[in-house]
Amino acid sequence: MYIEMIDETGQVSQEIMEQTLDLLNFAAQKTGKEEKEMSVTFVTNERSHELNLEYRDTDRPTDVISLEYKPETPILFSQEDFAADPSLAEMMAEFDAYIGELFISIDKAREQSQEYGHSFEREMGFLAVHGFLHINGYDHYTLEEEKEMFTLQEEILTAYGLTRQ
């Protein structure tokens, strides 16, 4: 999986960047998404607040914002189009590969790791996997969806070795 990592805060350690990259690749393997692409941006609470207001109409910071990429209009090409321009197939494959972007608030991750009594590394991993599942179509609006998503989330984190201790 190709993952672009961006640290807008300048506060994320190389270890956390590497853990996030490794964990998301592990999650992609577990869910059959190895050929996909995404981005992860680490932000402050202030930036998280702005994004939450813009995308979710919620006036407060949040821990992770997941923006699933869904083309708004289908792009249709004929066989003749592909024959005339061989680069179209490559472009469409790249287009299909991109699944979305995550914005993780490191401020919220620090707060929540203390609140829940586990490590900052565990919280960052939890938020990355939680967001990853969202941009892959998982949700928790109903009890059934919640059970499916949270079970998979915990399976990934446990198999990777990021437990609540």
Swiss-Prot record:
GO BP terms in the entry: rRNA processing
One annotated GO molecular function: RNA endonuclease activity
One Pfam assignment: YbeY
Binding note for cofactor: Binds 1 zinc ion.
Sequence positions that bind Zn(2+): H130, H134, H140
Alphabetically ordered keywords of this record: Cytoplasm, Endonuclease, Hydrolase, Metal-binding, Nuclease, Ribosome biogenesis, rRNA processing, Zinc
The enzyme's E.C. designation: 3.1.-.-
EC supergroup of this enzyme: hydrolase
InterPro entries: MetalPrtase_cat_dom_sf_prd, YbeY, YbeY_CS
Cofactor requirements of the protein: Zn(2+)
Entry's family note: Belongs to the endoribonuclease YbeY family.
Described purpose of this protein according to its UniProt entry: Single strand-specific metallo-endoribonuclease involved in late-stage 70S ribosome quality control and in maturation of the 3' terminus of the 16S rRNA.
Name this polypeptide is given: Endoribonuclease YbeY
Name of the gene encoding the protein in the UniProt record: ybeY
